[in-house]
Amino acid sequence: MNELIPLSAVRCNYGDVSGSRSVYLTFDDGPNPFCTPLVLDVLTQHRVPATFFVIGTYAADQPELIRRMIAEGHEVANHTMTHPDLSRCEAAEIHDEVLTASRAIRLACPQALPRHMRAPYGIWTEDVLATSAKAGLAAVHWSVDPRDWSRPGVDSIVKSVLAAVRPGAIVLLHDGYPPGEEASCIDSTSREQTVRALAYLIPALQLRGFEIHPLPQLH
């Protein structure tokens, strides 16, 4: 059944099992030729890893960015092929969206082996969870959402994250736009607030004793 499920059924954080005060940075809706390189530059400058939940059609169009993500030590994860609302999709379409996206990622970079999946818009159903699990993908939501996609201002993004972050938190940020909104991303200023906020957030989190890690491998 393609029925909505409660978020309690989906991984939203990883707790503090190791006592290391881990935090996980994740980026949705890329790779984008204007914005993703800037995000990668900031991550490289601060020597921290992130997980990029990429859209398959964009991975196919920007394989060099997928290769750069992997070369620089980041994880590339599955955000479906075309970013539909999966609650409106039949089981066969969900299957195609998930598996085709993983295939596109591997074609872009054979070293990229997706281990995690995030549903577009954070809308989860029983069919989505079942399809992800069958494909060997751990379903991952988030626990901290500064709504950077709405461009609320750099200070707002930073303050929202720092106010909500806890050990084991999964932070949601964006390095692109979903299909249909590409016109919003015509140059490198489109996600400028996210990039600038990230440059503040990483040292601020570290000063608070948090360690930024890749998402744990559950499969």
Swiss-Prot record:
Gene Ontology, cellular component aspect: cytoplasm; membrane
Q: Where in the cell is it found?
A: Cytoplasm
The record ties this protein, via PROSITE patterns, to: NODB
Q: Which GO terms describe its biological process?
A: carbohydrate metabolic process
Would the keyword Cytoplasm be found if you checked this record's keyword annotation? yes
Q: What is its EC number?
A: 3.5.1.-
Name the family.
Answer: Belongs to the polysaccharide deacetylase family.
Indicate what this protein is called per its UniProt record. Answer: Chitooligosaccharide deacetylase
